[in-house]
Amino acid sequence: MAILQTFSEQTISSARASDIKEPDYSVNSRPEICFFLNGIMEEKSLISLYLARDSHSAILSSILAVDPQQKLLIMDYGINETLNQIALKRGYLRCITSHNQIRIEFDCDNLQRVQFEGRHAFSADIPESLKRLQRRNFYRVTTSITNPAVCTIPLLRAADEAPVVYSLLDISCGGMALIDQPDADTLLKAGTTLEHCRIDLPGDGNLFSSIEASIQIAYVGTVILNNGNTCPRIGCEFINLPEKSRLLIQRYITKLEQQARKLETESGF
């Protein structure tokens, strides 16, 4: 079953234009496109299915099958039927994922609901083109749900005058995504710059590291949790992050990747 975006939107890069080190690479060959799609499927990479190019509302899905003969791409169906119906009515999805730490973008047309292995799934035409983007700061990882990283913003105060604390959904060396309380009217607004934000990165039972950073709010969207609750999702970009802090974040990302690989090995995937 598809998981709605309760965590990483590996999809929105917080890298600045100056961070782009390699040109975009468009793939237009059908065999090569299928090769990449199969790689994404075998890697079990999550895909963000956007309802529109400028939308921050997305369903996290995955590729279930690639059928070159029928020219069809089969993807996991969403958990939220309202979003599913909007997508089916539009017949179009903007798909963003990552493969081997490279951002992949493609469009899905002729979207339909089908039955696949006894359950609902999305069917779409195999895309005519696929874009690969290599960005230095793009690669994001999902933070732990059971032991989440948190960001304390001292310049914001809750009703009890305590600094506001947000949980992180994901993090990269270029930015992070925060989540607010369900149905909250978040205090954060797009374009706002906040200084002296403390980010606590947890370890195994203790604090892995803590850094201070200035951030700019890139966007404020929404995320639908598995339980159906809607929460504000805040995309943040680091401003002039010190090299020491960047290295700490990179080590934390490496640690999370090692934990994920260990779980995959133990579970037999």
Curated annotation (Swiss-Prot):
Single GO molecular function: cyclic-di-GMP binding
Chief location category: other
Residue ranges of domain PilZ in the record: 134-254
Record's keyword terms, sorted: Bacterial flagellum, c-di-GMP, Nucleotide-binding
Cell compartment(s), UniProt: Bacterial flagellum basal body
Protein name per Swiss-Prot or TrEMBL: Flagellar brake protein YcgR
Pfam family, one: PilZ
Any Gene Ontology CC annotation: bacterial-type flagellum basal body
Keyword hit for Membrane: no
Assembly and interaction partners: Monomer. Interacts with the flagellar basal bodies.
Gene3D superfamilies, A to Z: Electron Transport, Fmn-binding Protein, Chain A (2.30.110.10), predicted glycosyltransferase like domains (2.40.10.220)
Job of this protein: Acts as a flagellar brake, regulating swimming and swarming in a bis-(3'-5') cyclic diguanylic acid (c-di-GMP)-dependent manner. Binds 1 c-di-GMP dimer per subunit. Increasing levels of c-di-GMP lead to decreased motility.
GO biological process: bacterial-type flagellum-dependent cell motility; regulation of bacterial-type flagellum-dependent cell motility by regulation of motor speed
Annotated family: Belongs to the YcgR family.
InterPro entries with a match to the protein in the record: PilZ_domain, Split_barrel_FMN-bd, T3SS_YcgR, T3SS_YcgR_PilZN
Naturally occurring in which organism (per UniProt): Nitrosomonas eutropha (strain DSM 101675 / C91 / Nm57)
